[in-house]
């Protein structure tokens, strides 16, 4: 007869511990796989068309943001990714709380695209003047906003930079903006469309959208680079 192997109490306890560790590891991996993309802890929203600066950078380079060719192909996005990648991963979190409707006080000149250097400076690179990629639009266009959290809106304000302003060399100031649309309330949803009619604009401009959310005093400040055809 073969030698009979004796299983001790210590062996049994070790087996149970190993199995428990394996189960916990598998559960942890499953939970990590369910988390959203890196850096985005809370869903909010942004203008997706014409794409905001950081949304456009995430859209074009989010799957390959370490590609060195970006430095030549898309230099403004390159400097933004180098400054703080979380500004792109969190493309839907560019807001300030408690502005009380006094936006120039909360967001000084030269800091409009970062929402007054909100979120500890995460979005500061978006204030840089330069040749940001543009979206071609006509004099009549639609601003499309994605509100993942369905906050709703008390109102939207849509501005276009004055003719003659050069976003490739000039920091954006409130005095550079011309109001082209003001809306009423929007019920909570995930997708909003804001029709805009303009005249007299040509070439490169910034469309600046202010979104006053309804769920609290939370305001989004969003720069989209466009080319009027």
Language-model regions: role of each:
Residues 31-40:
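C-terminal segment of classical bacterial N-terminal signal peptides
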Residues 18-30:
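Sec-dependent N-terminal signal peptides
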Residues 217-229:
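Short beta-strand elements
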Residues 149, 164-165, 198-203, 229:
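A short, structured loop/turn motif at beta-sheet edges
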Residues 1-17:
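N-terminal secretory signal peptides that target proteins for export/translocation
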Residues 170-197:
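Extracellular carbohydrate recognition and processing domains
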Residues 161, 201-216:
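Internal, hydrophobic beta-strand segments that form the core of beta-sheet-rich folds
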Residues 42-151, 155-171:
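N-terminal "mature-chain" segments and other terminal, solvent-exposed stretches
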């Amino acid at each position: 007869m073969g030698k009979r192997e004796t299983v001790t109490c210590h062996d049994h306890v070790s087996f149970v511990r190993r199995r428990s560790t394996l189960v916990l590891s598998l559960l942890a991996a499953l939970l990590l796989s369910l988390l959203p993309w890196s850096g985005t802890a809370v869903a909010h929203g942004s203008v997706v068309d014409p794409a905001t600066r950081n949304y456009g950078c995430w859209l074009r380079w989010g799957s390959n943001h370490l590609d060195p060719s970006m430095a030549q192909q898309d230099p403004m996005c390159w400097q933004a990714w180098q400054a703080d990648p979380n500004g792109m991963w969190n493309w839907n979190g560019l807001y300030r709380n408690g502005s009380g409707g006094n936006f120039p006080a909360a967001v000084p000149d030269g800091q409009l695209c970062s929402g007054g250097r909100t979120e500890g400076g995460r979005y500061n690179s978006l204030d840089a003047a330069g040749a940001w990629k543009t979206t071609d639009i006509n004099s009549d266009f639609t601003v499309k906003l994605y509100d993942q959290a369905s906050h709703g809106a008390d109102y939207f304000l849509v501005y276009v930079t004055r003719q003659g302003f050069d976003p490739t060399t000039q920091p954006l100031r409130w005095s550079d903006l011309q109001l082209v649309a003001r809306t009423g309330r929007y019920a909570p949803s995930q997708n909003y469309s804001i029709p805009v009619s303009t005249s007299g604009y040509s070439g490169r401009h910034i469309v600046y959208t202010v979104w006053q959310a309804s769920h609290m005093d939370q305001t989004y400040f969003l720069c989209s680079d466009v080319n009027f055809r």
